[in-house]
């Protein structure tokens, strides 16, 4: 015990810079064989042909195992010669050993460091290496300075050039190398005390704890200063880290050489059977050489300066629990034993949650016996699992996330943690098939009653709300289907001002009125997004469905170039929801009506408030008698714009005085709007007198006259442009024909319409002189698309209603064109209108007379006025945001003076 306490740990670091050989003195194979029999402690791998030199340098310190240093290309590879006979190594080895300082001092004085240059002949198993040269390097000076009685320091280093001689004493070359001997003290011995016991069949070598402690040599990077030598860097021994050849060696007292080397976590061991010094047989030496061919020159950081053994990074989530090996045994020692038992037998791996290849990816480590490990691992597993569950229970959001993930991957939750009552609704799905059942059960088993009740309330509320949402969505879908037949579903447009569930619930409690407004806006946005897709591909079957639902027998529209108008028509008829309200009355009409009523209130409330003002505005801008409200649904883009009008109207300064009117007869309004829309469409397409006859008996609620008229749709410049363009087209074509000049142009305009629509929601109103009519016009060809944007909001008559243009002739042409269109409509339609319409008619008569010359002779001005006003108001009803003429227009002079400066009566 006293001897072991007095032992110290020493480090010997060796670096070979280069070797020079005299080519003429290279030994013959026969001579080499004789020399090797005497130098059997030198080892090494494959050799090349005599033409290629495959050298290796062997070092032997006292009776410790031999250290081999190879050229950079590794063992068996022909060494590169910068000039003939010179081989650059630049590599070295480092070893640790334990001895009593006095013993080491005494032995180093007597025994030098044996250095040999070997030639590795080719063949497998590797033949006996050939000795090319050898030299003895005295370590007496180092022993005096490090462990002698007058030791001057803990380390001594030396670099020099030493001559090589063969067995006959002839000089064969030179070797340049450096060495350093370091005293590491006794503090680190505790890390090397773990015994390594193994038996080798045939060799019969067994290493006992005592022998191991006495002759243990571990790897250490030569470039790393020892703890006691922090102030003395390596100096001349500048060994590149990448070139260090580190090999762990274990030697027994019985003169056995046990050489174990580690390469990338693989275990390979070599045991050289005991013999007296140089008396080992050649076969055991060859075996060592073969084994060490691939194992040397591998840099592995020694465990000396690490608290834990380094392990390869396991793949993520492969092993939940890893058992840390005790640090007493270096991993190289473990790897050195061939029969060593692995730490990860199946019994140990069974305690892992996910047994996998991770166990094989770690270098084997010698730890406690397997049964002890199993017990500890099982306890650790259970404890870790319990801790994890407890932690998750304190983090409800994380718990919810885990449950959601398990659902996504169809992995049932083995032991679901406590579910926070406020998050219980997360586990519910529409069909109630999700893990909410398990969640509920765990809640009840783990939560208090009050918590459960809270969770139940939350669940019920959220469920009810979700049900309502789903119902609304279904209604939307159903109405869309019924109105749009089998048309392709349009992808949702981007949400402008989204109404989240949280906001909806909060508003329901705090500000129901604002909730209504938000819902209307959302409806409006939905319609617009639907229109974007349906505008171009709505079959006429949609119109048929609508007409049948409205119980009015209107002629169906031809499918030629008015599909777009049909699409917009769907939107115009107060969107699919309103339509569904009309003919899905028993199931969904109540909810739809309510929503629609609120929407109509807001959208048409602006119409109503502006009702009085809008008539003036509409009539005055309209050079033609037709009020703005005569938005031709026949115009493809017009339908889209009717919606636009509603948001714009909100910005009007007109007083909201007729919101209540909206609610009076929502159902009536819906039917009327739909009928009017149908009538408009049929009028465009068929132009027959019977088009509007079924509408004639409809009741007109106040909203019909009240639809708002917003002036912000165009500037005077744009209006004049549209007038010119339209005028040019109208002169040569029938007014109706000009309205539908080309489907493509309508399409382009409608696209613009939609874009302008969104922007118009929050845009400030434009000049009062700019009529909505021009905005409603989509029938103008693409060449006039700029003007079309403004004109799209109203029918052809709306075109005429645009404010004055530079050329009055164009205005007159526009008026005449609109009047002629009105005339046609008058022939086709006979509608009951209120007395307010008649007064409007009278006030507009001067305009009619003005443009009467352009009307067909068979139509009277009165008819024109009649049809135009009725048409105008009917069309106004066909969409939420459509324009309307107010009843307050007393005289056309007012309109002309206020809205048409520069226009003389």
UniProtKB/Swiss-Prot annotation:
Its main location: cytoplasm. The gene is MAP10. Residues 567-579, 737-748, 830-855 have a biased composition (Polar residues). It comes from the Eukaryota. It comes from Homo sapiens. One of its GO terms (biological process) is cytoplasmic microtubule organization. One of its GO terms (molecular function) is microtubule binding. Residues 443-453, 721-736 have a biased composition (Basic and acidic residues). Pfam families: HPHLAWLY, MAP10_N. This is Microtubule-associated protein 10. It is found in: Cytoplasm, Cytoskeleton; Cytoplasm, Cytoskeleton, Spindle pole; Cytoplasm, Cytoskeleton, Microtubule organizing center, Centrosome; Midbody. Residues 208-227, 790-801 have a biased composition (Low complexity).
């Amino acid at each position: 015990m006293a001897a072991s306490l007095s032992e110290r740990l020493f480090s010997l670091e060796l670096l070979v810079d280069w070797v020079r050989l005299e080519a003429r003195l290279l030994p013959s194979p026969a001579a080499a064989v004789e020399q090797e029999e005497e130098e059997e402690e030198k080892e090494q791998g494959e050799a090349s042909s005599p033409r290629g030199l495959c050298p290796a340098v062997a070092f032997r310190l006292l009776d410790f195992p031999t250290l081999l240093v190879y050229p950079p290309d590794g063992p068996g590879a022909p060494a590169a010669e910068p000039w003939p006979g010179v081989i650059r190594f630049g590599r070295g080895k480092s070893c640790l050993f334990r001895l009593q300082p006095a013993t080491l001092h005494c032995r180093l004085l007597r025994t030098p460091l044996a250095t040999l240059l070997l030639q590795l002949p080719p063949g497998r198993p590797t033949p006996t290496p050939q000795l090319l040269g050898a030299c003895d390097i005295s370590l007496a000076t180092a022993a005096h300075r490090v462990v002698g009685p007058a030791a001057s320091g803990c380390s001594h280093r030396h670099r020099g050039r030493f001559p090589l001689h063969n067995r006959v004493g002839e000089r064969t070359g030179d070797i340049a190398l450096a060495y350093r001997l370091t005293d590491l003290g006794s503090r680190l011995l505790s890390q090397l005390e773990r015994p390594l016991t193994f038996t080798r069949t045939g060799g019969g070598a067994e290493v006992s704890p005592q022998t191991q402690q006495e002759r243990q040599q571990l790897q250490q990077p030569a470039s790393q200063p020892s703890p006691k030598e922090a102030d003395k860097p390596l100096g001349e021994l500048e060994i590149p880290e990448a070139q260090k050849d580190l090999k762990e060696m274990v030697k027994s007292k019985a003169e056995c050489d046990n050489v174990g080397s580690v390469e990338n976590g693989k275990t390979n061991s070599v045991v050289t059977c005991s013999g007296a010094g140089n008396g080992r047989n050649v076969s055991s030496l060859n075996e060592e050489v073969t084994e060490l061919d691939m194992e040397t020159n591998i840099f592995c950081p020694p465990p000396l300066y690490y608290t834990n053994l380094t392990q390869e990074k396991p793949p993520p989530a492969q092993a939940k629990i890893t058992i840390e090996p005790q640090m007493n045994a270096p991993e190289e020692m473990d790897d050195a034993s061939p029969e060593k038992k692995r730490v990860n037998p199946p019994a140990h791996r069974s305690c892992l949650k996910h047994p996998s290849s991770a166990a094989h990816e770690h270098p084997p480590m010698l730890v406690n016996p397997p049964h002890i490990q199993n017990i500890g691992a099982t306890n650790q597993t259970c404890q870790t699992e319990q801790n994890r569950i407890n932690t998750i229970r304190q983090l409800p959001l994380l718990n919810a996330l885990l449950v959601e993930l398990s659902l996504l991957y169809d992995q049932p939750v083995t032991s679901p943690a406590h579910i926070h009552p406020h998050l219980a609704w997360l586990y519910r799905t529409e069909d109630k098939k999700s893990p909410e059942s398990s969640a509920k059960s765990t809640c009840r088993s783990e939560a208090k009653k009050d918590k459960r009740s809270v969770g139940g309330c939350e669940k019920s509320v959220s469920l009810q709300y979700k049900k309502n949402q789903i119902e609304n969505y279904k209604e939307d879908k159903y109405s869309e289907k019924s109105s749009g037949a089998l048309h392709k579903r349009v992808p949702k447009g981007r949400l402008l001002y989204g109404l989240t569930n949280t906001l909806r619930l909060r508003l329901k409690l705090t500000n129901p009125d604002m909730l209504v407004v938000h819902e209307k806006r959302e409806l409006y946005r939905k319609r617009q997004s639907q229109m974007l897709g349906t505008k171009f591909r709505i079959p006429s079957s949609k119109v048929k469905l609508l007409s049948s639902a409205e119980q009015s027998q209107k002629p169906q529209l031809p499918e030629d170039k008015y599909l777009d108008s049909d699409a917009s028509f769907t939107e115009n008829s107060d969107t699919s929801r309103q339509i569904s309200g009309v003919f899905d009355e028993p199931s969904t009409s109540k909810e739809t009506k309510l929503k629609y009523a609120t929407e109509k209130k807001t959208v048409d409330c602006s119409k109503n408030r502006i009702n009085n003002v809008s008539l003036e505005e509409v009539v005055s801008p309209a050079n033609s008698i037709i009020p703005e409200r005569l938005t031709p649904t026949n115009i493809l883009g017009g339908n889209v714009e009717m919606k636009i009008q509603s948001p714009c109207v909100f910005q009007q300064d007109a007083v909201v005085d007729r919101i209540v009117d909206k609610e009076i007869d929502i159902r009536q309004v819906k039917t009327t709007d739909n009928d009017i829309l149908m009538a408009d469409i049929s009028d465009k397409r068929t132009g027959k007198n019977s088009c509007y006859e079924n509408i004639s008996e409809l009741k007109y609620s106040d909203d019909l006259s009240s639809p708002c008229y917003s002036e912000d749709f165009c500037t005077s410049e744009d209006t004049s442009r549209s007038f010119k363009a339209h005028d040019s087209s109208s002169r040569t074509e029938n007014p109706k024909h000009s309205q539908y000049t080309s489907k493509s142009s309508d399409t382009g305009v409608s696209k613009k319409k939609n874009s302008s629509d969104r922007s118009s929601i929050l845009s400030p109103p434009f000049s009062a002189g700019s009529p909505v009519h021009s905005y409603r016009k989509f029938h103008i060809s693409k060449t006039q698309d700029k003007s079309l944007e403004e004109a799209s909001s109203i029918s052809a008559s709306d075109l005429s209603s645009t404010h004055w243009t530079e050329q009055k002739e164009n205005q007159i042409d526009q008026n005449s064109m609109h009047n002629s269109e009105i005339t046609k409509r008058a022939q086709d339609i006979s509608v009951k209108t209120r007395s307010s319409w008649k007064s409007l008619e009278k006030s507009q008569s001067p305009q009619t007379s003005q443009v009467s010359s352009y009307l067909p002779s068979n139509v009277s001005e009165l008819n024109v006025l009649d049809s135009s006003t009725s048409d105008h108001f009917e069309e106004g009803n066909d969409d939420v945001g459509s324009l309307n003429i107010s009843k307050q227009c007393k005289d056309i002079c007012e309109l002309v003076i206020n809205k048409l400066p520069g226009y003389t009566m």
